[in-house]
Design a protein with these regions (language model features):
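Bacterial Sec-dependent N-terminal signal peptides
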Residues: 1-20
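C-terminal terminal-subdomain/extension
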Residues: 108, 116-118
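Central antiparallel beta-sheet cores of small beta-barrel/beta-sandwich binding domains
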Residues: 26, 32-100, 104-106, 139
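Residue-level recognition of beta-strand termini and adjacent short loop/turns
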Residues: 87, 111-113
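Short polar/acidic secondary-structure junctions
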Residues: 99, 110, 124-125
Length: 142
């Protein structure tokens, strides 16, 4: 009986630990150019990223491939979609939209020991891509 209780306790602790780890990505991050803040949030078990501050809030999504969206402001734009936690501080199977060029890329996110993110956008395989370092910050939305 003691072994069963011990096993169940360890199983529950391991499960809760894994769940907390997936949510470790949630927070606010400054982009490498320090001209935008990205808020990562969870919805229905997947992770998304939205621009909650931009240096020039009047900037429009003028490079969007959809002409109907080119008049939208970049502020508030969801640029990261559908990431799943894959363990080892990695979130995969998502996409990232780059409003500077209007292109959407496959994407993988890793978190370092300081809580910062390395966001790798790529086409096809992650070997052919670019990584940007986003710094975790405390930020209160206006």
């Amino acid at each position: 009986m003691k072994n069963l209780i011990l096993f169940l306790s360890l199983f529950v602790a391991a499960t809760l630990s894994a769940q907390n780890k997936a949510g470790d990505i949630v927070g606010t991050y400054m982009n490498p150019d320090a001209d935008a803040v990205l808020k990562i949030y969870e919805s229905s078990g997947k992770y998304f990223g939205k621009l909650i501050w931009v240096k020039n809030p009047a900037n429009l999504d003028s490079n969007n491939p959809d002409p109907a969206k080119r008049s939208q402001k970049r502020l508030g734009l969801v640029i990261m979609n559908n990431f799943k936690f894959d363990g080892d501080d990695t979130w995969e199977d998502g996409t990232i939209y780059d409003p500077k060029n209007g292109k959407t890329y496959d994407c993988k996110v890793t978190r370092d020991t300081k809580g910062n993110l390395d966001i790798r956008g790529y086409i096809g395989i992650s070997l052919l891509g670019r990584t940007s370092h986003f710094t975790k910050i405390e930020f209160k939305e206006p």
